[in-house]
Structure formats: C-alpha cells, structure tokens
C-alpha cells in the first residue's frame, strides 16, 4: 500500500521540492509513497480568495481563518491519517512520532503562514501540533518537508539496508556513534584502531560507548531520559 501525504499550503509548488531527489525521489517514482499539495487559496473567501484576517485582541500580522482551514481539511478527508500542524508552539517532534507516522497509511500536513492558524480550527480537526526546533520559520512548508523526509526514509523499501534505520541517532534513545571511511589516515588524523581490528564485538562496544558519550555531552535531556529508562546512574558509565 502506498504511503500517502497530503500537504495543505499556500505554496503548493514547494512540493515535492527536495523530496523529489535521492532516496525519497526514487521511492516517489517507484510508488512507495505519494504527495499531493493542495492550495489553501482554493478554499478562500470571495473573489480574492481571502484566507486570513486580523487577530482578535490586536497585535501584528494576520491569522489564517478557521472556516477556510477547516474546509480544506474536511475536503481532503484524512481517513485514518494523522493531521499534523508544524508550529513552534507544538511539542518536540521525536523519532517515536516519526516511526508512528511512517507505520500508518500516511499524513495530512497543514502549513501555517502569517501568525499561524486560528486555534479553533486546530482543536475542531484534532490537529497534532509538533515543533522541529526552538526557532521560527517563515511558514510551515520547510518544517513539512523535514517531517515528510523523516517519515519517508522509514517506509519499507526506501533505504537500502534495514539496519540504516535501526543503527542511527534516536533509534535507541541515544545519538549515533561517529563514522569513518577511507583513507585510514588523513591530514594526520587516523581512524580509531579498533575499527580496523575486525573484532565485531569490540567494535560494537566502542560504538555504544561513543553513542553514550556524545549523548551525555551534547544532549543532556536525552541522556537523563536514557538513565531513567535503563535505571542506571552517571557513575555507571
């Protein structure tokens, strides 16, 4: 069954964009997934297809109208597909979320613009509000591309090796270990000897240690969650 993505946006020409290249592009051509970009302007009001209005309570910018947004959502009929709204106000997008989305029939992604979407439309349509980081973009389209790419690569048959999806950052709650390739020595920097040893158990242990070290130093939030999940303490590492 083809994994279906529908994107509701004011800029449909942004899709598939970079998702038409590389692994995602080949999977798109091969029918492993599909993407349809619907122009929210089609659901706008009046001769000028108005999609936004001034915010109640005052303030800068414009807000996307609930009647326009909800009409678009109901027209695409998510049919079991989660409705996701990328926004800095959302909960952090996690790899567990990505796996859940990728394991289903697809996604409907609503891309906001201006000051965002009227909250009533999001509540009425049961949108999942997710954030890809603590920063602000011009609109939801770039975040939608990030979200879709993270999902598409987990669809069976997209990546060349199943291990690629299980031996990477966040697959076990830790950041991934570092990678090396030829030449073995480059500008005075050598590949760690253990990776050249052929001792698979020792290599696996080294990679685990490197993952733990990177997570502890770069992502203390993930490290704290790892300690809680495993029941270990810092002193044991």
UniProtKB/Swiss-Prot annotation:
Disulfide bonds: none annotated. It catalyses: guanosine(37) in tRNA + S-adenosyl-L-methionine = N(1)-methylguanosine(37) in tRNA + S-adenosyl-L-homocysteine + H(+). It is an enzyme of class 2 (transferase). The keyword S-adenosyl-L-methionine applies. It is found in: Cytoplasm. GO terms for molecular function: tRNA (guanine(37)-N1)-methyltransferase activity. Its main location: cytoplasm. One of its GO terms (cellular component) is cytosol. InterPro entries: Alpha/beta_knot_MTases, tRNA_m1G_MeTrfase_C_sf, tRNA_m1G_MeTrfase_TrmD, tRNA_m1G_MTases_N, tRNA_MeTrfase_TRMD/TRM10. S-adenosyl-L-methionine binds at residues 112, 132-137. Keywords: Cytoplasm, Methyltransferase, S-adenosyl-L-methionine, Transferase, tRNA processing. Pfam families: tRNA_m1G_MT. One of its GO terms (biological process) is tRNA N1-guanine methylation. It comes from the Bacteria. Its EC number is 2.1.1.228. Specifically methylates guanosine-37 in various tRNAs. Belongs to the RNA methyltransferase TrmD family. Homodimer. This is tRNA (guanine-N(1)-)-methyltransferase. The gene is trmD.
